[in-house]
A protein has these predicted regions:
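His/Asp/Glu-enriched, well-ordered alpha-helical/loop segment
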Residues: 206, 285-319
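Active-site loop ensemble at the mouth of alpha/beta enzyme cores that anchors a bound cofactor
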Residues: 256, 263-280
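Active-site environment of divalent metal-dependent phosphoester hydrolases
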Residues: 85-87, 118-123, 141-143, 180-183, ...
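N-terminal metal-binding scaffold of metallo-dependent hydrolase/deaminase domains
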Residues: 1-63, 72-74
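Glycine-enriched alpha-helix->loop->beta-strand junction motifs that scaffold or abut catalytic
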Residues: 226-231, 247-253, 271-272, 299-301
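Histidine-centered catalytic micro-motifs
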Residues: 75-87, 204, 211-216, 232
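Divalent-metal coordination cores built from histidine and acidic residues
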Residues: 7-21, 94-209, 251-260, 266
């Protein structure tokens, strides 16, 4: 693309996990037909692509301008765990959210699975220069058991109702906080009783939504996978037994390895007051590659996600 044009994206497919997009040039004059020739990834086949009005079409097209020849052609990248409209302190304004989304587009991300945000970003759907977004509504957590200003905070008896609410405000996903530090126990612990978690997941499924959950520990993902959850975020505590059940049920995993690199600094902050938690976080970090490799080798569906937003900067999916 030339420097004075902006990318616009046309959605071709959507199954809840993936989109396929085609970038085109934004022009005030009628869009010209384009020809692109190169090696198309991931197949590695050299092909000619023809673009009419920003959309891939069957060619050839008479009079089409060659936009690129002898190049590599790749689809837009997908960030399966991202947070548009969120920073370290909670919800951000539209201007900041716009900047976050533009950063993702400039670095190649054309589809974002937003894994929880306190901001309403549906205005992005009307912007052709920004990535498409599949939203999970707002995180759902218990009071004082997650990052301040991030989540809809409810007690367990109100979880099903909150899942109902977030399922209706999202785009087919609901995001639970599966575990967090329990300050009374001094370590990671699940947020939800198993029976209530299962009832909440069942309600989401009744509404046609899938459920995913933030999980660092061993206990929470085991409980939630048994309860019928569709995906696990982070997954540093996955055991062999949990992995086997995930494979059997087709449960996805988004490891967010960029986020997991922060575990040592989190542990260092907890050393004095919560030594058990600090040691646990260091253990999870030390075994992160082994754990994710086991899930991969077993056949768990794994998706790339950065956890951008909050304290992780945007535009890192290629990393």
């Amino acid at each position: 693309m030339t420097e004075d044009t902006q990318p616009l994206f046309h959605t071709h497919t959507h199954d809840g996990w993936t989109h396929t997009h085609m970038a085109r040039e934004a022009q005030t004059a009628p869009a010209e037909d384009l020809r692109i020739r190169g090696v198309v990834l991931p197949d590695g086949e050299e092909r000619e692509l023809w673009v009419h009005d920003g959309v891939l079409v069957e060619g050839p097209l008479s009079g089409a301008r060659t936009l690129a020849d002898g190049c590599w052609i790749i689809p837009g990248l997908v960030d399966a765990h991202n947070h548009i409209g969120l920073d370290a302190h909670g919800a951000v304004g539209t201007e900041t959210a716009d900047e976050q989304a533009r950063t993702e587009a400039k670095t190649g991300t054309l589809l974002i699975r937003d894994a929880g945000s306190p901001s309403d970003t549906h205005w992005i759907d009307d912007r052709d220069d920004l990535p498409r977004v599949i939203r999970a509504g707002r995180h759902i957590a218990r009071p004082k058991r997650y990052i301040r200003n991030y989540a809809a905070e409810v007690d367990p008896e109100n979880l099903v109702a909150e899942v109902d609410r977030q399922a209706r405000s999202g785009d087919g996903w609901v995001k639970l906080v599966g575990d967090w530090i329990d300050r009374d126990e001094g370590d990671l612990a699940p947020l939800w009783p198993a029976d209530i978690a299962q009832a909440a997941i069942d309600r989401a499924h009744e509404l046609g939504a899938r459920v995913t959950a933030h999980c660092f520990s061993e206990e929470a993902p085991a409980q939630l996978v048994d309860a019928g959850i569709d995906c696990i975020e982070h997954g540093t505590g996955l055991t062999d037994e949990t992995i086997a059940t995930m494979v059997e049920r087709g449960v996805g995993l988004v490891p967010t390895l960029i986020n997991i690199e922060t575990f040592p600094s989190i542990a260092a902050q907890a050393d004095g007051k919560f030594p058990k938690y600090a040691a646990h976080m260091r253990h999870l970090h030390a075994h992160r590659h082994e754990t994710i490799a086991k899930a991969w080798d077993a056949g768990v569906p794994i998706y790339a996600g950065t956890d951008a937003g909050g304290t992780i900067k945007h535009g890192l999916i290629a990393s």
